[in-house]
Amino acid sequence: MRALPTTATTLLGVLFFPSASRSQYVRDLGTEQWTLSSATLNRTVPAQFPSQVHMDLLREGIIDEPYNDLNDFNLRWIADANWTYTSGKIEGLGEDYESTWLVFDGLDTFASISFCGQFVGATDNQFRQYMFDVSSILKACPEEPTLGIQFGSAPNIVDAIAQDPSSPTWPEGVQITYEYPNRWFMRKEQSDFGWDWGPAFAPAGPWKPGYVVQLKQAAPVYVRNTDLDIYRLGQINYLPPDQTQPWVVNASLDYLGSLPENPSMAIEVKDLQSGEILASRPLTNITVTEGSVTGVTVLEGVDPKLWWPQGLGDQNLYNVTISVTDGGNQSVAEVTKRTGFRTIFLNQRNITDAQLAQGIAPGANWHFEVNGHEFYAKGSNLIPPDCFWTRVTEDTMTRLFDAVVAGNQNMLRVWSSGAYLHDYIYDLADEKGILLCSEFQFSDALYPTDDAFLENVAAEVVYNVRRVNHHPSLALWAGGNEIESLMLLLVEAADPESYPFYVGEYEKMYISLFLPLVYENTRSISYSPSSTTEGYLDIDLSAPVPMAERYSNTTEGEYYGDTDHYNYDASIAFDYGTYPVGRFANEFGFHSMPSLQTWQQALTDPADLTFNSSVVMLRNHHYPAGGLMTDNYHNTVARHGRNDPGRAGLLPDAQHSVRPRGQLQRLVPRDPALPGGPLQVTNPVLPAGQRAARTPARVPVLAARGHLAGALVGGDRVRRPLEGPHYVARDIYKPVIVSPFWNYTTGALDIYVTSDLWTAAAGSVTLTWRDLSGKPIASNGGLPTKPLPFHVGALNSTRLYRMNMKQQPLPRHEDAILALELTATGSLPNTDEEVTFTHEQWFTPAFPKDLDLVNLRVRVEYDAPLGKFAVEATAGVALYTWLEHPEGVVGYFEENSFVVVPGQKKVVGFVVQADETDGEWVHDVTVRSLWDLNEGE
């Protein structure tokens, strides 16, 4: 069930022409006939609304799929042109309405609007809702009106702004250009101008719905936005809420029209599943400001079922109906929003004496607490699922979020920039228990801070904070991506004398402006001025800068904020001394090649399916070109050279493949295999609840951006196969795991057990050395032959065993693999039932390139009665065994990138999300392993 976005009368207005009896009429602009034109195109074509120019041109056959081949370059003429959307005659608008408005939920980006041939207004912010009063224009219009929206070329407009002598400039080398320059002058999706993971199409168009709204005096108002804030009594954004306090419901409606004097407000809270009415009562402290009405109530004696992230409990949801009435109890407005009761708090407070006594490292916290409970954040970074939002569907996001849940993830960081997510995406996250750490759309740049710019972005922030605040999946607002952790460092290096000035500019917008705007519109959500910080020293809401950031005021041996780490030098990937230590891993990763199936969707010429083809190389945007050049070979070669695991001596080298396509086919599963090591132990740091030791214990982690990142191919990106990191993360995101932590520089190998349960767990781990033919190694290589018992505390890790591989009595490290098999008992969060947990890990004491791999004779067969796939290796241990499904089916394997030992059959299921083969795809599933990197084709 979806939340009703507006009142029932508003919805009826979309379906019927106005009549004398109806006091409000709303017409969806998507029902009109639209055309698209441009002097560059020299023709007019049919269009849709909402839409974007590229999508209308694609539908009409003017261009082919933008993601194909090098269309990133070939279609730049679209971004360089101005485009006009023109409606047909809008018939049937009423003449007896006092006011007529145009309401646009999203115009991308620089638009000039005309109605009945008259200029109405202009827009310059993709992320704002715009309203224009066209009452006088309509009354003077001699015929049925038409609506025109002209979109200017964003690249040309920001270039002109940059050339204006009054525009700000920054020290040389600070601002980061990916393809189109000057993106910091526009309030538009920053990745539209290119990023290191995707193309630069710079789309334009009416990307969200629009309406004609007609109102009568002293009649129901049109609700254009709603802020529903649910929190504990006394809750403050930056302090942990008292879970014993009753719930507070604060409801605010933004409207068009005129409210009667002394309006009343009330709410009804209904259980979505049972239909039971939990509460029905009036709101108090009614305040009316320009265009908004707000009221509040305390739900004394009301005990709703809590909403929990997936894996921690149920996703209990409620419909809250907010009504506004006049003195005669006549309805003025009514809105229903689906929501949940939960508290979510980002704890950045100093480590307490009690925590120190538990062995927690000193410094400051950086972790989330839901309903008063600390928990491990397990997830990914979410970048735009498509460069063109108008073709992202609910089905698209459902499949993506189903994969998130199947991957044992409970949180996504909504990376900026990106765009603010549509409401239906938050709805899906509410249903599936996925927390969404959201950010304001500022990324990897310094931005203007003049009054006009700040006024523009303030309206953007307020609108979006209020719009999504009712969603229980909303976990955080951050000011932007890497502003503090990267941009301030760059400006300090480029111009040390000006550094204090730019710190002041940063604080002016992200702290002094944004923090109060967040706190004024929500009591339930925490705020951080940047995605990655060292946390704050103090908060004083009466100070000019209300949050005093820590910056570099750190003490050695203490740990503070979250980390953001990229190092593409594969030769030091397992030197864990190179990794940062913090409380939370916010973003990290290792670039990898997509699957061959993905490449086949994007490349129309099979001859381009080679590792070093110009198309493959130029589609790799890391390192970015830094401009509009179309020959970025130097940077792409530099990236491949540094983080190619084969060249770094980690994996077998597939460069010798006889046939170019075979070379590519062997390279593409290789990179996803590598994170099977680093992903488990990247960012070995200490969250609250862990001991003060440098361990691989599970950090609250938003994992490598590559998990869900990248609008690389296909309009429906999630139709492509899931890559290796998703499956590796799924495995290590299980509730209780065993991890080998090997520092190859010292030889130390530590075996840890990590639990994200809220109570202690106990069990045992069996360690077994085998050679690569699968046979046990004599005397178990010096390890105990009996299972090793363990007891691990809540949200904690315990070191089970320590050895030094340089002293371990193994015949040959190149012919050895260690199996780690865990069995444990414990209780899942919010349950008392005892559950048995199992987990399996593997470790090789030599890099895969140096292993004595044998011809495994690995095979896969479909077991029809079971509906699953059986994988066997008859001649040797199959490392990083990889199942791949053919085209024509969409879904994911329940496991992948696993180890198969001779004599042990691996049975793997597959979740089908869409099937165009009538089930025949099961006969074309293929299997490969690390051995295949040694083989030519």
UniProtKB/Swiss-Prot annotation:
Gene3D superfamilies: Galactose-binding domain-like (2.60.120.260), Glycosidases (3.20.20.80), Immunoglobulins (2.60.40.10). Glycans are attached at N42, N82, N250, N285, N319, N329, N350, N553, N612, N743, N796. Pathway: Glycan metabolism; N-glycan degradation. Optimum pH is 2.0. Stable from pH 4 to pH 7. Residues 1-23 form the signal peptide. The active site is at E482. Its main location: secreted. Homodimer. Belongs to the glycosyl hydrolase 2 family. Beta-mannosidase A subfamily. This is Beta-mannosidase A. It comes from Aspergillus aculeatus.
